């Protein structure tokens, strides 16, 4: 390697052969060098409000180093870290991840980067994952925010957790000490990265300083950036090498700035990615094929209003990977981006893994190379300097010939040397002569370019996120879907060139009559909703005959054979017949747009949820029934607000309460004063499908139904309705309830209007448990049968607690109930809130608490400060009506779901049940059943607990005969 000239900023200049020689041999010294420049980090906050700009935090590399040094000194002074021992850094945002990555590294410990995505929705899997980390990393310390501690606290003792908030250096410097002096060797570990999140057993990959710098030298040599001093940008989470190594460390080592953007900002509106690339003159960023496909569709549809007028992409170098790139997408987008100055062959498909520090094999000529050879999918190019690849024959007899399919193996300085504390996995991962087995099947074409051609493992890869098929099978089994035969589900990933990414194919054996279109529709809708919730994608569902799904002598379906048969077209006739039957049924339900506004909103919904034209989704179909995620709801909300230029914009709660194109249109008309007079309807339809007895849910004291949305996705066999309190639409003249009797009678009347005959099933969460009891009591008094009445973590005697819930308590409860802050943090603000409330400054109290809330969650909810004030006042009014409530009378039976009590109410579950919940026995004729569920009073329906909660609920409903 020729000698390079070291620039005055301490960074290296490319030599004549394209390689660089850095003046440091570890990333700590790289940060110290970067701290002597004026470069730094531009970190954006989550934007879900619909505006085109979001606030950004500017942190120079000098400030990053100083903050990390102060934190490291504090960690060392408290003896919290040990040199060369892992410390888990668990964060949901880039700023925390960066600061605490360096804080841990500067103590000499090994930062292990994780995020909320590593946790399964299944409690058993979460515990298994944490136990595995406990063993693999030798009981590591975990640093995180209080708001993210839930999964760790539910498995207390596996990992010692400390909150970032409790570790920040004192403003007065009282806990300050000298910054640590650390000089890592090249072979020291710079980070531990996990190979998988919630699926499978995670392997910890040690990435050394030498490996990082070798990888960055190779990446730099391949790219030959036209604007080498321009910033890098990432919207990927920091627990992925595509950000930590390929952007964050890369930018620091290169001595350039970096832009960190939350994924939601890009995924909600991909056009904003182009705007950010232009505004910051970004040279290097990463995006997968599905995002390019979304961009192309937006351009093709002419939806470019949000693009900057002076868009300039001249500096751009687009790394892409994680899934195969469709050449038609790249070729279609290339001339569009070129109009804004993007260079030819702007797409750089690559092959990379955690074990290779992200991309290590690059195609520098996409789409031209692959267009000339008529490829459907982009090739992955050739190895960067310092890396070699080979294809080994499937029979193990040696190296494959060009074009011959085999096992991809790689070696080189940028490749890791083995998994942390896992000798078995390490032995399996390397050949006898030391080459790394990637686990991919591939071939090399005549031009020397790599092509992937399948995987030796069964992972489903959707938008770069991997899922285990057997976990999806299990989720479908657990859901007990009407119309589907138990043990006859088979999930796998499949893809054609026309698809942006892999999709989950679900093959199942129907339990309905072939001519029953309604039952077929309900079964398919349930499958779609469930898989969409787990994978954030719409599955391909195909019902088969029993003879098409033979089982082995051990009772197993052959996933490989069924996948091969589907992809060979053997089930095409069944799929076509199924689609025709679904269309027939939808034709009987479909609602056509009655106005231009309805047509616009329907079009936005169809585009966001990518509902095919063949699917007759109409204006009366619920967004929620299509498996829409919270991100989908936010995206639809933003686009409707923007395209219809609404004076009073929609909020996230509107998306839930008016979840059809027609409902949203009526909501807009009501709030703008142009529609018919608003009429309060207490019923929110969370899940319209299924033939079993409907489940009615009563809101907690906050009056809203947001808490039930995740649960409704898991209830597939019956309609799910929820009651929403009166008074939220104050602008339309809607006034709050004035008495509990009005609440009981209003909800009972609405219930009878939708379901005139029993048997009935009703449950209430917290405060709603009391309301459910009173409604059930009235129904029984009128001769109706109530087979299921549920109180979810509420005792019968509540007036003492209601008297404690003054206005300041209500605002505290609301803010941690909707995840704006955790309970412990919320209560630290009680004195200030009491002071503001005494002064009659309630709106100021909301604004004060907002300053201490999670800004990303605030934006996601999309509500104004004034709306929160209305909400708190309604909650206070609702609970104030119960200060003199005394239970009386009785119901036939009651099921009490028991979660951890509020800390202000009881210390333990035993005390909670025996001291307070047991009093229900005086108001139930045939006995009370208690069912313990995971989580605490305000968390038992959160994503990490809701799957098992739903499983318990389904069991109880079955036992009660509904």
Swiss-Prot record:
Residues 694-951 are annotated as: Thioesterase (TE) domain. One of its GO terms (molecular function) is CoA-ligase activity. Residues 34-462 are annotated as: Adenylation (A) domain. SUPFAM superfamilies: Acetyl-CoA synthetase-like, ACP-like, alpha/beta-Hydrolases. Keywords: Phosphopantetheine, Phosphoprotein, Transferase. Disruption phenotype: Abbolishes the production of asterriquinone CT5. This is Nonribosomal peptide synthetase atqA. It comes from Aspergillus terreus (strain NIH 2624 / FGSC A1156). The lineage of its organism: Eukaryota, Fungi, Dikarya, Ascomycota, Pezizomycotina.
